[in-house]
C-alpha cells in the first residue's frame, strides 16, 4: 500500500477517535449521584421506620452506612457565659461561633451574633422564638464563612444562608435555602424558588424532582431532617402522596 495512503488513513482514524471522545457525555464534578428509594408512605418520626417499595429499610441503609456515619452535623450547646445557645463552626477555616440572643431593644425578637474570639463580626435578626432554634449551620473554609439560620415570624418559616455577610436568598432569589454543608470539601445546600427545588454544589445549581424536602423539624420530627455526612446527604422528600428516601452524594469516595 502507498505509504502516503497509510499515513492518511492513520490520521483519519485518530481524528475519528478524538471526535468520538469529545462527543461522550461525562459527569461533571458539580453533579452528584442521586439514589432514590420510593416508599409505601411517609416515614415515622417517632420510630425512624420507613417502608421502601420492594425491599427493606435495612437493605437500603446498608448501602452507604459507613459513609452516612461520617456525620458533619452542627451541634448547639447552651452557654451561660455566652448568654444563650452557641454553635461552633465546622471546616478548616478560622474558628468562629454563632450565639443566639434575645434583643435588648425589642424582646422577644432574636438576634444571631457571629463571634471571632471576643469580637462580634456579624449580627442578624433571627425573627421570633419558635419550636426550632434559629442556629442551623456554621462553616468556615477557604477564607469564607457561611451561616444558616431559620428565620421565624407569624407568616414566615424560612431558611436563610449568609455567605461572608451576604444573604444568598436575596442575591439568588431563593424562597428558602437550607442544609448548608461542605460535601466532599465543596459548598452544598438545598434551595427553593417559585419554579421548584434544587441543590447547589461546587458553583452549580441542579434541579430536584420533588415538591418538598423535609427540614427544620423539631422534637421527634427532627429525625426526618436531612442528615449531612462528609461525602453525602440523606433526606426524605415527597411529591403529592409519593414519598422517597434519598441519598445524594459523591459515592466514589465511599
Indicate where each model-derived feature is located.
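Short, linear, compositionally biased motifs with a strong N-terminal bias
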Residues: 10-11, 202
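C-terminal motif of bacterial Sec signal peptides marking the signal peptidase cleavage site
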Residues: 17-20
Amino acid at each position: 500500500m502507498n505509504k502516503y495512503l497509510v499515513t492518511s488513513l492513520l490520521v483519519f482514524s485518530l481524528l475519528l477517535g478524538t471526535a468520538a471522545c469529545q462527543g461522550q457525555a461525562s459527569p461533571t464534578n458539580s453533579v452528584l449521584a442521586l439514589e432514590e428509594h420510593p416508599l409505601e408512605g411517609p416515614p415515622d418520626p417517632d420510630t425512624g421506620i420507613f417502608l421502601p417499595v420492594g425491599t427493606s429499610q435495612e437493605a437500603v441503609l446498608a448501602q452507604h452506612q459507613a459513609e452516612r456515619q461520617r456525620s458533619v452535623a452542627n451541634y448547639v450547646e447552651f452557654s451561660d457565659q455566652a448568654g444563650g445557645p452557641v454553635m461552633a463552626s465546622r471546616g478548616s477555616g478560622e474558628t468562629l461561633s454563632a450565639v443566639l440572643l434575645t434583643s435588648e431593644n425589642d424582646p422577644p425578637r432574636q438576634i444571631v451574633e457571629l463571634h471571632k474570639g471576643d469580637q462580634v463580626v456579624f449580627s442578624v435578626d433571627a425573627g421570633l422564638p419558635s419550636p426550632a432554634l434559629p442556629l442551623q449551620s456554621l462553616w468556615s473554609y477557604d477564607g469564607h464563612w457561611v451561616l444558616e439560620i431559620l428565620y421565624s415570624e407569624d407568616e414566615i418559616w424560612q431558611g436563610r444562608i449568609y455567605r461572608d455577610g451576604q444573604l444568598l436568598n436575596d442575591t439568588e432569589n431563593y424562597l428558602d435555602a437550607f442544609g448548608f454543608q461542605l460535601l466532599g470539601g465543596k459548598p452544598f445546600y438545598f434551595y427553593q424558588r417559585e419554579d421548584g427545588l434544587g441543590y447547589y454544589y461546587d458553583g452549580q445549581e441542579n434541579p430536584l424532582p420533588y415538591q418538598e424536602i423535609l427540614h427544620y423539624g423539631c422534637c421527634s420530627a427532627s429525625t426526618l431532617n436531612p442528615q449531612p455526612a462528609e461525602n453525602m446527604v440523606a433526606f426524605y422528600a415527597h411529591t403529592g402522596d409519593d414519598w422517597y428516601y434519598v441519598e445524594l452524594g459523591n459515592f466514589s469516595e465511599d
